[in-house]
Structures are given as C-alpha cells and as structure tokens.
Amino acid sequence: LAKINLGLDVLGRRENGYHDVRMVMQTIYLYDEVKLTKKKEPGIELTTNLGFLPTGDTNIAYKAAKLLIEEFGISEGVKIVLNKHIPVAAGLAGGSSDAAAVLFGMNRMFGLHLQQKDLMERGVKLGADVPYCIMRGTVLAEGIGEELSVLPAMPKCTVLIAKPPVSVSTKVVYEALDSEEIIEHPDIDALIEGLRQKDLHRISENMGNVLEDVTIPMHPVIEELKQVMRENGAIGAMMSGSGPTVFGLFENRAAAREAQRKIRESGLTKQVYVTNVHN
C-alpha cells in the first residue's frame, strides 16, 4: 500500500548527513501486487511488469528477500512476481511497501514466526520508510523517520493522487534544503489535534510540507496540480514526500472524479488516481 505525508517538517541536519524530521504519514488504498513462490533451488528470481525496474540486488524487494534468506539460512529459493501500480519514484513509498510485503510474505511462507516489531527492526536496514509500511495507518514519524507512534485514525475521505511526468531525487531535494532557511514550519501538533477531533477541515488547514519550497521551483507543474485540485473541490492539496506526486483530500467522491477528469484534460499528467485512506 502507498503512503502520503499529511505533514512533513525538517528540524535539522545531523553530522552524518541524515535529517531530523517530524512527519505525519497515512496509508492510502493504492497498491502493488507481490506474489511469492518457493523454489527448490536456492536463489532469488524477481520479475516485474515494468521493464525499466532493476530485478537484481539493487531492487529493494530483492534485498528484503536476501536479508531473510541470509539471516535464517533458508536453503530454498524464492520467486517474486512484482506487479506495480503505485507510481515509481513518486514520494509514495512504493518500493518500501514492496519490501514490507516481501518481509511479511516470507515470514509466513517459511514459518519464521517474526512479530511486527521484529519485521520493523529488519525493515529499517532496507530503508527509512519500510518500518512504516509494515505498521501502516496514521502514524507520527520522528528522529530520522524511524521513531514511529500511532496516531488517531484519519477520518474517511476520498484522496486524489496525481503524479506528473517528472523525476525527483529525494537525495537532491534534502541536500538543497538548508533547514536554517525554512521560513515557515508546518504546525504538526495542530494537524494531530485535527486527527484527534476527526475534523477533515482542520487537518487540511494544517497540512504542510517544507520540501515543497525546494521541489516546486524545480517543477512548477506541482503547484499547477495543487491549484486544479483546489479549484475543483479539494479541501486541501499538497505534495507528498519529496515529490513530485500531489494529493488532494475530498469529502465528495464525485468532485474527486471531476478533478481527475480536469487534470487529464489539462495535459498536466495522465497518472491520476481516485482512492481512499486506509486504516
């Protein structure tokens, strides 16, 4: 399952280059399909429906399988069939959710009896978003993104996702961000209070992402997508993660469908999806 960031604040940069963050993350019902099958012969075989994706040990789903095979001395091999629906390199944690699915599936398939916290401890070795993709739901992430706390569940609403045809490097965006020059930090506490009150309007008013100040000047189409969503009934619209994906929150599914149609007609992007929050 994909994730969006309802709030993303950067508090500072550590000496090792990692950034201290405070983020509110939410799972949405947009998913990849991951099928695992045991093989008698050892080794990992990964296939995917997208020809440009790596299928070897640079693929995070492959790395997840390799991690468990090596740690537990699994003699059999595994075949992974990855059917991608979540846009790639979009700020939606698609790769991280695939890795989480492989950890879940292999835990069950090989009877490893790992609990959720055990899977999360292994997930963080693969990527900062993997533990969250194991946990799912409405979650506060702190530290470098590895300290997770469950929040009151996001109220039901329709989510419109639009991925423009541009690529964004998370590394480049964070490197360009000088935390001392962040003029306005999002009010994460007010956002959390909106979640407690199950008030979609208060949540939307307090959404914020400091990385927009870096990514939008690189790709103005992000601001254009936000504008189209707001003009067509979105209560709030924001870039997710380091971008370039934009999401809008709607109370009315019909309005979200109309905004989807307008975005496609505008030529801004063809990758537009109507979905829901998933708790």
Across the structure, where does each feature detected by a protein language model lie?
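Residues embedded in well-ordered beta-strands within globular domains across many folds
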Residues: 35, 79-81, 238, 273-276
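Short, basic/glycine-rich phosphate-binding loops at helix/coil junctions
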Residues: 40-54, 102, 197-207
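ATP-binding N-lobe of GHMP and related small-molecule kinases
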Residues: 1-90, 108, 112-120, 154, ...
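Hydrophobic packing within well-folded, soluble alpha/beta domains
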Residues: 34, 61, 80, 102, ...
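ATP-dependent small-molecule kinase catalytic core of the GHMP/sugar-kinase superfamily
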Residues: 7-23, 109-236, 249-279
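Glycine/serine-rich anion-binding loops at beta->alpha junctions
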Residues: 81-110, 128, 235-250
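A generic structural signal for well-ordered coil/turn residues at beta-strand boundaries
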Residues: 2, 30, 134-135, 155-158, ...
